[in-house]
Amino acid sequence: MSDLTHLDETGKARMVDVGAKDETLREAVVRGEVHMRPETLQRLAAGDMPKGDALATARIAGIMAAKRAPDLIPLCHPLLLTHVAVDVRLDAATSTVQIEATVRTVGKTGVEMEALTAVSVAALTVYDMCKAIDRTMQIGAIRLVRKSGGRSGEIVCE
């Protein structure tokens, strides 16, 4: 269990002490998608949704969610985020809403959880705003694409 930093010597969950770590520029990029019927995607593109501008709302929801990650995820460190961007685009070929979040900070721990939270909540927001016309939607493929900073250096997952 020694390689699991969120567990103490007895196996109990704990918040990792990052006090001795150096402050470095940290960045994480996460992607995810919402699959939907082509008709739903067309209505999104046309801005014809019963609840309003779903894509703009999803972007803002994702940004807000990144800032609230420590309130949602136990033992997640509160961080001073220096940048949060959420990009939401439509892919007609796959009938998906593609979501990408980039989060940065200068700090002692990474920002993957904040980026994962941003994409997750943006996807949930798209779902919520489209569910009245499409109950077949699926949220999926939420994954870390890249992270950098700290002892691990750069990690590229795709």
Curated annotation (Swiss-Prot):
Functional description taken from the UniProt entry: Catalyzes the conversion of (8S)-3',8-cyclo-7,8-dihydroguanosine 5'-triphosphate to cyclic pyranopterin monophosphate (cPMP).
Binding, substrate: L75, C76, H77, M113, E114
Claim: Iron-sulfur is one of the keywords in the record: no
InterPro entries per UniProt: MoaC, MoaC_bact/euk, MoaC_sf, MoCo_biosynth_MoaA/MoaC, Mopterin_CF_biosynth-C_dom
The protein's annotated pathway: Cofactor biosynthesis; molybdopterin biosynthesis
Alphabetical GO biological process terms: Mo-molybdopterin cofactor biosynthetic process
Keyword Flavoprotein found: no
Swiss-Prot/TrEMBL catalytic activity: (8S)-3',8-cyclo-7,8-dihydroguanosine 5'-triphosphate = cyclic pyranopterin phosphate + diphosphate
Sequence similarity: Belongs to the MoaC family.
Subunit structure: Homohexamer; trimer of dimers.
HAMAP family listed in its UniProt record: MoaC_B
GO molecular function: cyclic pyranopterin monophosphate synthase activity
Enzyme class: lyase
Protein name: Cyclic pyranopterin monophosphate synthase
UniProt-annotated catalytic positions: D128
Assigned keywords, A-Z: Lyase, Molybdenum cofactor biosynthesis
UniProt EC number: 4.6.1.17
